[in-house]
Amino acid sequence: MAKLHDLYKDTVVAELQKQFGYKSVMQVPRIEKITLNMGVGEAISDKKVLEHATNDLTAISGQKPITTVARKSVAGFKIREGYPIGTKVTLRGERMWEFLERLISISIPRIRDFRGLNPKSFDGRGNYSMGVREQIIFPEIEYDKIDKIRGLDITITTSAKDNEEGLALLSAFDFPFKKKV
């Protein structure tokens, strides 16, 4: 079992229950899923690009991603409805906890010019989204084997009711948020 999951069950639940005054442990916010999304606009002209992006996301997540398609045609972007334009994967359970552990302890410290995550990136319902400019911050990606540096979006979906609860939950896992000056 992942260390972060044990930390959550053993200490974080008790801390948050005390901090927010919950009567039941079931009211304590928890991480429900982590979604990784890689939009690949170049896939319109070259199908191999989408294949490389899928391989990168598979290596990062340990799970096969699905291909996302355009919902409607946009002439300005030269895309038609149904064109494959990206790839995404949703992590839950054990894989989610292991990915979160690798993200916090290994990948985030490898980001160039990193000064902390923006605490304002919550959506109003306790879910946190962040963008990564380079997929090479993940140790599973070998620099020599990638065709191009791509970014990806990471969304952490929680059961928190508001941003304050979500921030408290992720801070309990030692997420490196920027400190208010």
From Swiss-Prot:
PROSITE patterns per UniProt? RIBOSOMAL_L5
Cross-referenced HAMAP family: Ribosomal_uL5_B
The species this protein belongs to is Colwellia psychrerythraea (strain 34H / ATCC BAA-681) (Vibrio psychroerythus)
The Gene Ontology terms for molecular function here are:
rRNA binding; structural constituent of ribosome; tRNA binding
Subunit annotation: Part of the 50S ribosomal subunit; part of the 5S rRNA/L5/L18/L25 subcomplex. Contacts the 5S rRNA and the P site tRNA. Forms a bridge to the 30S subunit in the 70S ribosome.
Quote the gene name from the UniProt entry.
Answer: rplE
List the Pfam families hit by this protein, alphabetically: Ribosomal_L5, Ribosomal_L5_C
Q: What is this protein called?
A: Large ribosomal subunit protein uL5
* Family statement drawn from the similarity comment of this UniProt entry: Belongs to the universal ribosomal protein uL5 family.
Which GO biological process categories is it annotated with? translation
